[in-house]
């Protein structure tokens, strides 16, 4: 009902703007609708005019010229439907509801669109996607079409570039941190206190102190004392003597105290020249240079000798020129040149 009222109001507005009467507009609408039906039924122009005259619709009351009616009947026959708002919306929806897959296929059966990627990347897709945007829901369709393309571009090109940059930065950071660790280790070796020790002497000293601190076995001491009493008729070791020996060892241990120094400490020299530059001993220099990736000439020469060892050539047996190899033919003795028959 609301659509009918809006259509009647639209007719009154058209009549007021164009200077037409309401009945003329109504008659014109009837004629256009009638012509549209005849055109859809494949009638010719003469048959359409004959049908209009026989139907009793007065042409004099209409403001549409006969030539315009002929053009309308010959071309579309749907002027009334095309001028209405619902028909415009339906036509636009039909025009814009194309298949995006078919729009991208530039085949002979499809509408040809020139390549537009020479302007900027993605121009061809955008020109094809414009025809697939729904005017009734343009925001949602635009977001779906353009947003998906942007996401594909970011995950494809930009994503790979970002991943490549992250890998490069991570590798550079690892190399920088490793160099920093090597530098800290080299500086710690330069400022450390070095002590010269001998492992064999320390081992024997440890064993001597260990066995010296063991408690005396009463059974062995008693047996040793009885052996000497029987052999010499008197005791060489009294209980008081044994106790004095044990107490003397304990007193000596208290006086000496724990051994703090386990070797000879190497004296640390001050930087020469007074400029406080970095310095190291000669025996420590190859280790520090190796941490920084440099090699001393002696070390480089030794590595070169170990890596470039020539392969041993196979020795073939050689024979002297004067001696000939022995013949394997057996000796048959001396024969005459002329034989008798």
Swiss-Prot record:
Task: Output the InterPro entries linked to this UniProt entry.
Answer: Polyoma_coat_VP2
- Gene Ontology cellular component annotations, sorted alphabetically: host cell; host cell endoplasmic reticulum membrane; host cell nucleus; membrane; viral capsid
Q: Where is this region: D1?
A: 262-297
Q: Which residues are covalently lipidated (N-myristoyl glycine)?
A: 2
User: What keywords does the record list, in alphabetical order?
Assistant: Capsid protein, DNA-binding, Host endoplasmic reticulum, Host membrane, Host nucleus, Late protein, Lipoprotein, Membrane, Myristate, Viral penetration into host nucleus, Virion, Virus entry into host cell
Q: Which residue numbers does the motif Nuclear localization signal cover?
A: 309-317
Basic residues compositional bias, start-end = 327-341
Query: Where is this chain compositionally biased, Polar residues type?
Result: 317-326
Q: Determine the domain of life of the protein's source.
A: Viruses
Name a Pfam family for this protein.
Polyoma_coat2
GO MF, one annotated term = structural molecule activity
Identify the stretch annotated as signal peptide in this record.
none
Return the annotated region ranges for DNA-binding: 302-341
Q: Where is this region: Disordered?
A: 310-341
Q: What biological-process terms (Gene Ontology) are attached?
A: symbiont entry into host cell; viral penetration into host nucleus
Q: Which family does it belong to?
A: Belongs to the polyomaviruses capsid protein VP2 family.
Protein's recorded name: Minor capsid protein VP2
Q: What organism does the UniProt record list as the source?
A: Budgerigar fledgling disease virus (BFPyV)
Q: What is the lineage of its organism?
A: Viruses, Monodnaviria, Shotokuvirae, Cossaviricota, Papovaviricetes
């Amino acid at each position: 009902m609301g659509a009918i009222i809006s259509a009647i109001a639209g007719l009154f507005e058209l009549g007021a703007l164009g200077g037409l009467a309401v009945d003329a507009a109504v008659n014109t609408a009837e004629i256009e609708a009638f012509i549209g039906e005849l055109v859809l039924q494949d009638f010719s122009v003469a048959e359409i005019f004959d049908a209009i005259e026989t139907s009793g619709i007065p042409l004099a009351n209409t403001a549409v010229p006969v030539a315009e009616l002929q053009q309308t009947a010959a071309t579309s026959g749907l002027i009334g439907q095309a001028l209405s708002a619902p028909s415009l919306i339906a036509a636009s929806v039909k025009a814009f509801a194309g298949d995006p897959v078919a729009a991208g296929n530039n085949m002979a059966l499809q509408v040809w669109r020139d390549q537009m990627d020479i302007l900027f990347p993605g121009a061809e897709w955008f020109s094809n996607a414009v025809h697939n945007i729904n005017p009734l829901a343009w925001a949602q369709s635009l977001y779906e079409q353009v947003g998906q393309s942007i996401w594909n571009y970011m995950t494809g090109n930009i994503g790979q570039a970002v991943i490549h940059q992250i890998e490069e930065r991570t590798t550079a950071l690892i190399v920088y941190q490793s160099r920093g660790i090597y530098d800290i280790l080299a500086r710690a070796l330069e400022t450390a206190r070095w002590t010269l020790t001998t492992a064999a002497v320390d081992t024997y000293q440890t064993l001597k102190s260990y066995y010296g601190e063991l408690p005396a076995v009463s059974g062995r001491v008693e047996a040793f004392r009885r052996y000497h009493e029987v052999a010499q008729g008197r005791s060489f070791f009294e209980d008081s003597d044994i106790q004095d020996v044990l107490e003397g060892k304990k007193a000596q241990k208290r006086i000496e105290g724990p051994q703090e120094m386990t070797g000879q400490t190497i004296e640390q020299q001050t930087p020469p020249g007074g400029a406080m530059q970095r310095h190291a001993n000669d025996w420590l220099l190859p280790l520090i240079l190796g941490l920084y990736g440099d090699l001393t000439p002696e070390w480089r020469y030794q590595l070169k000798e170990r890596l470039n060892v020539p392969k041993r050539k196979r020795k073939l047996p050689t024979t002297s020129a004067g001696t000939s190899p022995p013949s394997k033919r057996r000796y048959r003795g001396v024969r005459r040149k002329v034989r008798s028959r």
